[in-house]
Regions:
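Radical SAM enzyme core and accessory elements
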Residues: 207-383
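Local cysteine-cluster metal-coordination motifs and their immediate loop/turn environment
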Residues: 1
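Conserved SAM/AdoMet-binding glycine-rich loop
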Residues: 8-128, 133-135
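Acidic/polar loop patches that form or flank catalytic/metal-binding clefts of enzymes
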Residues: 27-29, 58-59, 157-161, 235-240, ...
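Phosphate/diphosphate-binding loops
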Residues: 60-63, 145-150, 161
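Short, hinge-like loop/turn segments at secondary-structure boundaries
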Residues: 45-46, 146-147, 176-180
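Catalytic cores of alpha/beta
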Residues: 72-78, 136-152, 219
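Flexible glycine/acidic-rich beta-alpha junction loops that bind and position SAM and/or redox cofactors
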Residues: 37-39, 93, 97-104, 133-141, ...
Length: 383
């Protein structure tokens, strides 16, 4: 049985004091369920008080308890009021009740989930949701439906989709569980996120579940590509307003919209967006064969980016071309999209000035993705 281990409060408060006194701009809390203990509210208050006292830490990030409760709402308001909260997690993993039973997980009830999204949004507190692809019992159809459910609930900017890791000493590592759900995993290189590739550093590897009885490998690959397309073009804003219009005005599901986009990207591989989509497919196949996940473009610095951020940032380096070319998708789509919606979408995202690509990628794409700064792409950065 897993027990929660608590560090002495005086030690925790001492660490917070040290961070403030030594002008630590960013502090990442290692709690896996911050907000699950009563004292966590007091710790949040001490963090806010320390920032008032020293001006530091400027930002505090943590992993909140998986089922959002009133304590997390209180903590979020305390940290947000002090200007040091990046965002609040509304973790779902899957939207399918059968899958949740298979992994012994209880989610926030969906009706309550939608209310929470609106509640935090009204308070100006950024939220994000995490889904995991390839869970036992999840089909391609149920996974896409789960992504749609999040978008329908108003999670437009903060959707993150992750692969399913097979970890030692977990239920997914037990032979009888593996056999029951038809789990197949592949040893893949760990993704280096926002780090500089170094050939002298030992490469870490992870066991990733790439097939289940419910999701054949081909479906798993399509689920991953669908996830990346939604993260690039919806969650990061490139076609978000157009997709929302098609959904609200024409009843088009988000799954239908983005799967049609995937078809268009495949057929129009010579476009800027088509090139990035082709790059995603090549990257995935190479990684499945044991290759690296590294995504480096020296315009964006010398670090490796997550695939969805990499594609988004590169498209933003030539936005006029992207929006000119995507007009062909609007015609291919055959759903009426008014010129006003197209123009508003074109104006919603502002890319970097020549020579400023690295700063843009760092400040807006990396630092801004899980926080309020991400909304600057649609609000503060308008021309």
């Amino acid at each position: 049985m897993t027990k929660v281990r608590q560090l002495p409060e005086e030690w925790v408060y001492g660490e917070i004091e040290w961070a403030g006194l030594n002008r630590m701009e960013y502090v990442d809390g290692c709690d896996s369920n911050f907000g699950i203990l009563k004292r966590d509210v007091d710790i949040a208050k001490r963090l806010a008080e320390t920032k008032v006292k020293y001006g530091y830490p400027q930002t505090y990030r943590t992993s909140f308890a998986k089922n959002s409760n009133e304590a997390i709402w209180t903590i979020a308001n305390i940290l947000h009021g002090a200007g040091m909260l990046k965002s609040v997690t509304l973790a779902m993993q899957s939207m399918d009740q059968g899958v949740l039973q298979n992994i012994h997980r209880k989610n926030i009830k969906f009706d309550h989930f939608g209310e929470l999204v609106k509640k935090y949004e009204a308070a100006g507190i950024p939220t994000y949701t995490e889904l995991i692809m390839g869970l036992p019992g999840e089909t391609l159809e149920s996974y896409i439906a789960g992504v749609e459910s999040n978008l329908n609930a108003g999670v437009s900017d903060g959707l993150f989709c992750y692969m399913n890791l097979r970890l030692p000493n977990t239920e997914q590592d037990k032979p009888e569980y593996v056999e029951k759900y038809g789990l197949r995993s592949v040893s893949m290189q760990a993704m280096l996120t926002h780090g500089t590739p170094n050939p002298d550093v030992v490469v870490e590897r992870q066991e990733i579940i790439v097939e289940t009885a419910a999701m054949p490998h081909a479906d798993w690959k399509r689920a991953w590509l669908f996830s990346k397309v939604v993260e690039i073009f919806h969650a990061q804003g490139l076609l978000q307003q157009v997709a929302i219009h098609c959904h609200e005005a024409n009843g088009v599901s988000y799954g239908e919209f983005y799967q049609s986009l995937m078809m268009w990207l495949t057929n129009w591989s010579g476009t800027l967006a088509g090139r990035e989509y082709r790059g995603l497919r090549i990257l995935l196949d190479g990684s499945l064969d044991g290759g690296s996940w590294d995504c480096v473009d020296h315009r964006l610095g010398d670090i490796s980016w997550p695939p969805e951020e990499f594609a988004f940032a590169r498209i933003c380096c030539d936005l006029p071309r992207f929006y000119d070319e995507v007009e062909a998708f609007y015609d291919f789509w055959e759903v009426p999209i008014p010129r006003s919606v197209r123009d508003d979408q074109r104006q919603a995202i502002v890319g970097p000035e020549p020579g400023q690509e690295r700063d843009f990628a760092t400040r807006i794409v990396w630092w801004g993705r899980k926080g309020a700064a991400a909304k600057l792409r649609k609000e503060g950065l308008k021309t």
